[in-house]
């Protein structure tokens, strides 16, 4: 058995942690800035949450085509056959470009219908949503292509390039958020323009590095690559999984919006903050989960099952330790975090009533993400799809019905259902891992 060294894990994980933190920081920066805009704070904060939710849904649904390419590149890297996937990478890049442009155009044209019909936005909230949406939607193609390129970098066993690019984007977003909001007084439009500028910069730099450091490029390939259909099948599995994820998140935002009475947007604004904190937390340990996926994909290509078991054991304790530390910090600075997020008293009080659920979810979320990352890396997309369907249908929906319709817990009911959902997701993958990998014969290291 070839034991994966801690140094190798950290080489991939630490840059991925920083990259992962920067991504939600860009979104979190918009949220914090919105929470400190004095005029119509609740509506501005709600608009940022609603639009960010839709764009994230769009992104994480269509990003699955690029997520699948990571395992394909990792396989080729492990076998020393990168030249055989040049055409496949080019076709995935062109596919991402076409999908993203069509999606942005369609979303821009139908923006008011989407916000009114699916998010129940109206009045002042709708006006702010449209202002923010009409700018941010054009960042979608830039972000999708950037993340596709970063997926290629990860399959290439390099996470440092993505880290440098993400840091650059985060700094640009932070600086121009301040300039556009506090100096130019563009308010919510300033938030949108700062994000778009950061996304454009990250895309340009990503393309430059891809051309200079990897054998992959944008070019038109004659004929379909032999592995293109396999990649599409894996993408379809992840697409179903991601669609259900975004359906759950959309459902939660819709319910949070409907829970508000007489135009009060306190609940949806608070739900936005809780989602942002939860998302930020996951990226603190998701770098190690991603590293597990990259290494496991390489090991699985040569059937090194015992090495995979040892890798998972190492990472299990790492992510559990990180998530437990996050929970402890959140408990110690419980009220300070709420004050940092917003100065609105109503939102702060509701935040304090529900934040403890987010804290308790951290260790379970970390373990769930670990097995998700490992399974993505090995290309076990059907297992991920099926686990998600079961967790949603048998976990989230029944829990949501009980908490909201029978117990009437309001926002607490939404997050209690999230808790049950994440337990189901992690539990199913853990049981599958035990049944699959502990029945496999040990292969010699190569």
Tell where the protein language model's regions lie, with residue ranges.
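Short runs within selected transmembrane alpha-helices of multi-pass transporters and secretion channels
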Residues: 63-66, 135-154, 162-173, 191-206, ...
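Hydrophobic alpha-helical transmembrane segments in multi-pass integral membrane proteins
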Residues: 396-404
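Small-residue-rich hydrophobic transmembrane alpha-helices
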Residues: 45-105, 146-162, 268-332, 366-379, ...
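Short alpha-helical transmembrane segments in multi-pass integral membrane proteins
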Residues: 1-16, 73-141, 172, 183-236, ...
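Hydrophobic/aromatic residues in alpha-helical transmembrane segments
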Residues: 14, 30, 69, 110-111, ...
């Amino acid at each position: 058995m070839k034991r994966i060294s801690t140094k190798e894990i950290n080489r991939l994980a630490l840059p991925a942690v920083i990259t992962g933190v920067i991504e939600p920081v860009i979104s979190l920066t918009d949220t914090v800035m919105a929470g400190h805009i004095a005029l119509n704070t609740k509506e501005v904060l709600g608009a940022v949450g609603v639009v960010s939710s839709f764009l994230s849904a769009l992104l994480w649904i269509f990003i699955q085509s690029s997520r699948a390419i990571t395992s394909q590149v990792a396989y080729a890297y492990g076998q020393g056959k990168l030249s055989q996937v040049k055409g496949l990478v080019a076709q995935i890049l062109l596919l991402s470009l076409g999908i993203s442009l069509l999606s942005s155009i369609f979303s821009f044209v139908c923006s008011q219908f989407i916000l009114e019909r699916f998010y129940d936005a109206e009045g002042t909230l709708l006006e702010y949503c449209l202002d923010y949406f009409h700018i941010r939607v054009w960042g979608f193609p830039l972000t999708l292509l950037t993340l596709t390129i970063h997926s290629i970098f990860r399959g290439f066993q390099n996470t440092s390039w993505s880290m440098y690019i993400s840091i650059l984007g985060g700094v640009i977003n932070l600086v121009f958020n301040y300039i556009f909001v506090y100096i130019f007084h563009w308010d919510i439009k300033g938030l949108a323009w700062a994000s778009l500028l950061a996304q454009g910069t990250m895309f340009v730099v990503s393309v430059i590095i891809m051309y200079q450091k990897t054998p992959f490029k944008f070019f038109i390939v004659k004929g379909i690559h032999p592995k293109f259909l396999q990649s599409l099948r894996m993408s379809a599995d992840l697409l179903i999984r991601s669609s259900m994820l975004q359906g759950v998140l959309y459902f939660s935002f819709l319910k949070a919006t409907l829970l508000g009475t007489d135009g009060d947007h306190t609940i949806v604004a608070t739900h936005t903050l809780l989602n942002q904190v939860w998302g930020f937390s996951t990226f603190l340990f998701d770098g190690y989960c991603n590293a597990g996926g990259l290494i496991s994909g390489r090991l699985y290509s040569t059937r090194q099952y015992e090495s995979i078991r040892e890798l998972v054991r190492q990472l299990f304790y790492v992510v559990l330790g990180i998530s437990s530390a996050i929970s402890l910090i959140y408990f110690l600075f419980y009220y300070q975090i709420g004050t940092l997020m917003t100065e609105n008293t109503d939102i702060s009080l509701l935040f304090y009533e529900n934040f403890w659920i987010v804290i308790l979810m951290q260790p379970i979320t970390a373990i769930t993400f670990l097995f998700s990352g490992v399974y993505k890396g090995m290309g076990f997309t059907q297992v991920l799809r099926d686990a998600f369907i079961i967790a949603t249908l048998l976990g989230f929906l029944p829990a949501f019905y009980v908490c909201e319709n029978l117990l009437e817990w309001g926002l607490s009911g939404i997050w209690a259902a999230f808790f049950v959902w994440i337990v189901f997701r992690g539990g199913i993958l853990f049981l599958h891992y035990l049944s699959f990998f502990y029945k496999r014969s040990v292969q010699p290291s190569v």
